[in-house]
Design a protein with these regions (language model features):
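Acidic, surface-exposed loops and disordered segments
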Residues: 1-447
Length: 447
């Protein structure tokens, strides 16, 4: 198992079979994926000990191959080339809208192209991090102008780094996961994909959006205006502010869309490849991140804070890997605002003229965005710092770092479905998966 090894010249498809299965997966009909999608939880080596669907798998656990994992991971969070950004708003024309924070698009949408999420994943061999949110275009094209699956997989393999050995430890019991998942979640041989979003960064981006359009916020929790905003009357309407909780619900919702639609994209790829699995939220997110307070269950190892004002711990980031745009990863919220400005307008960002792109005159398009002024950044930072000071964290009413939707992939035990279900419980791709993706193993099983 594991991921493809790095070879001289990169990962190469070693057989005609690998070329063929990749092409077949890319050409799988969208309608079949949409309407053939089901949560198929019963994997090789699984057991349901009781009830009307009791069954013991006769098959040995079979981990996903490196190629299978790369296909699924690329579908879940892969780069899809340069995104087109939001192009116009009359308020600041002829400048192009400057909302986006990433220059590249991915297999899932992100509100205004902010893209704050990244993917962690675990298998039998370890815990890994796949970094694609600020990647340049990785969409390799063949001589026919179509996507080259081999080049795409190779490019994304280079985005992965290993964090630790061994499968992520999640006790298969409550309260670490919901009881109905204890028999099938994170089982040996499976791939568990864990998208994580930076809500703190997304909220800063939302505050920038508000200021760009002449708005500001007030503290509706404590029924207070934010002190210091009067000096920005030339930028924002201080007399008609938006409520803080509205903005924070907005930020959390938009981040959740990233996490969920990424999993859904991977779910569709499961159908194309003929793998079992499902997307779900039935693992405790504090257990996964490592903020449960249980030293026996360190999870991903994110640092977190607690406070008597909060009912739950607040994760802020994994140092050196995935750090939220908030203290203690930044000394104050002004520094976090500056970091977002660098991501947008600095080298590689969506509004830097030297960043490549899809337009005939990309430098002109990217360079036409209005760069944040010092006054602009100070206005955003004033609101953000108020929230941090008043609530002890940023955002004030929702988590700084968030995860709540996951994707699992495994080899499907068809015998369970043949025994308990009417015909049609799985697709032709599931029926032929072992024959197509594991030819040598299938011959051995058939003897």
């Amino acid at each position: 198992m594991g991921l493809p090894n790095k070879r001289k010249g990169g990962y190469k498809m070693s057989t005609v079979i690998e070329h063929s299965v990749l092409r077949d997966a890319f050409q799988f009909p969208l309608g079949d994926a949409l309407f053939g999608r089901r949560s198929r939880r019963f994997s090789f080596g699984t057991s349901i000990p009781d009830g009307p669907l009791s069954f013991q798998s006769p098959r040995d656990v079979l981990p996903l191959t490196g190629l299978e994992q790369m296909m699924l991971l690329t579908a879940t969070c892969g780069n899809t080339g340069w995104h087109y950004m939001i192009t116009r708003h009359a308020r600041y024309a002829p400048h192009i809208s400057n909302y986006s924070a990433a220059a590249g698009g991915r297999t899932f949408p992100s509100a205004a192209g902010v893209h704050t999420s990244e993917v962690f994943f675990t298998n039998d061999e370890g815990v890994f991090f796949m970094e694609t949110r600020d990647a340049p275009s990785l969409l390799g094209l063949g001589t026919d102008g179509k996507t080259d699956p081999e080049a795409l997989v190779e490019a994304h393999r280079k985005c992965i780094r290993k964090l630790s050995d061994g499968r992520l430890h999640i006790p298969r019991e409550e309260p670490y996961m919901l009881g109905h998942n204890t028999w099938c979640a994170n089982v040996p041989g499976s791939l568990l994909v864990i998208p994580v979003g930076d809500v703190a960064q997304h909220e800063i981006a939302l505050l920038c959006f508000l200021v760009q359009n002449g708005y500001c916020i007030y503290d509706d929790v404590n029924r207070l205006k934010i002190s210091g905003l009067d000096r920005f009357r030339g930028l924002v309407d201080v007399d008609h502010p938006y409520p803080l909780t509205w903005v924070e619900q907005y930020a959390l919702t938009e981040v959740t869309v990233e996490l969920s639609t990424g999993c859904y994209a991977g779910m569709l790829m499961l159908q194309a490849m003929g793998l079992g699995g499902w997307m779900y939220d039935g693992i405790d997110r504090y257990t996964l991140l490592g903020t449960s307070g249980d030293p026996k269950v360190p999870g991903l190892g994110f640092r977190y804070d607690t406070d008597d004002r909060w009912a739950l711990p607040n994760p802020t980031g994994l140092p050196g890997v995935f750090e939220g745009y908030c203290p203690p990863h930044y000394p104050n919220m002004r520094a976090a605002v500056e970091a977002l400005a660098r991501r947008k307008f600095g080298p590689g960002g969506p509004f830097h003229p030297d960043t490549p792109g899809p337009w005939k005159d990309t430098a002109k398009v990217r360079g036409s965005a209005q760069v944040y002024s010092e006054e602009f950044k100070e206005c955003v930072a004033t609101m953000a710092q108020y929230v941090y000071d008043k609530f002890g964290k940023f955002p004030g009413t929702v988590p700084s770092i968030y995860t709540h939707m996951f994707l699992q992939a495994h080899h499907l035990d068809l015998e369970f479905y043949d025994f308990h279900f009417k015909p049609g419980a799985y697709l032709e791709t599931h029926k032929r998966h072992m024959e197509r993706w594991h030819t040598n193993r299938q011959r051995s099983c058939d003897r």
